[in-house]
Every structure is written in C-alpha cells, then in structure tokens.
UniProtKB/Swiss-Prot annotation:
Keywords: Chloroplast, Plastid, Ribonucleoprotein, Ribosomal protein, Transit peptide. SUPFAM superfamilies: Ribosomal protein S16. The keyword Ribonucleoprotein applies. Expressed in leaves, stems and flowers, and, to a lower extent, in roots. This is Small ribosomal subunit protein bS16cy.
C-alpha cells in the first residue's frame, strides 16, 4: 500500500477549499482518508495567515515512514520549510553545440556535480 500526502477538495462550485490529507494512492480524490494534516484555501489573500494551516509534526512523521507528497503538496511543504527543493536540471543550448545537462541548486544557483 503506497501512501500519498495530497489535497482533497471540499467547498462548493467556484469556491474551492482543500484539506491536506494522507490517503492510499489508489483511493479516489475525495475518498477514504487516513488522516487530515491541514487545510488550504486558495481564495484567501497570499499574505493571509488563514490561507494554509499544516500540522508540522504529523507531516514530518508521515514523511519519515515513507509517504510521498504530490507535486502541489510538495511545493507547499517547500514554502513552509519542511522539505528541501528538487534539484533543477539545466540543458545546453539548441544551436548545435554539445548538449550537456547539469544539475543546478534552486536555492543558490550553483552547479552541482
């Protein structure tokens, strides 16, 4: 059983509201959940404190036992400072030059080997 940390949609039409939940990968988006870890209200202002609320200790626990966050939740956790960012890949130019891909740190911009 693979466990994901993902968003479950609540609210009504044109007024979305999401819960950050732990659920089995094969369950439906709004289906059975193992645990609720917080909420996300996309219609609140960006600087509003009520936009995102997360239970940091429970998220750390689920990440430690192998739960995989979805891309959206992963970006939320990065902004909250819980996980490091994914390394970015820089691809060479298309002008016929030798193309080499290099990994770049998204925080410092340094090339990683």
């Amino acid at each position: 059983m693979t466990v994901k940390i993902r968003l479950a949609r609540l609210g009504c039409k044109h007024r979305p509201f999401y819960r950050v939940v732990v659920a089995d990968e094969k369950s439906r988006r709004d289906g059975k959940q193992i645990e609720v870890l917080g909420f996300y209200d996309p219609l609140q202002g960006k600087e509003d404190a009520d936009r995102v609320s997360l239970k940091f200790d429970r998220i750390k626990y689920w990440l430690s036992v192998g739960a995989q966050p979805t891309d959206t939740v992963e970006s939320m956790l990065f902004r909250a400072g819980l996980i490091p960012p994914k390394p970015m890949v820089v691809v060479g130019s298309k002008n016929g030059q030798k193309s080499t891909s290099q990994h770049v740190s998204p925080i410092t911009g340094e090339i990683l080997n």
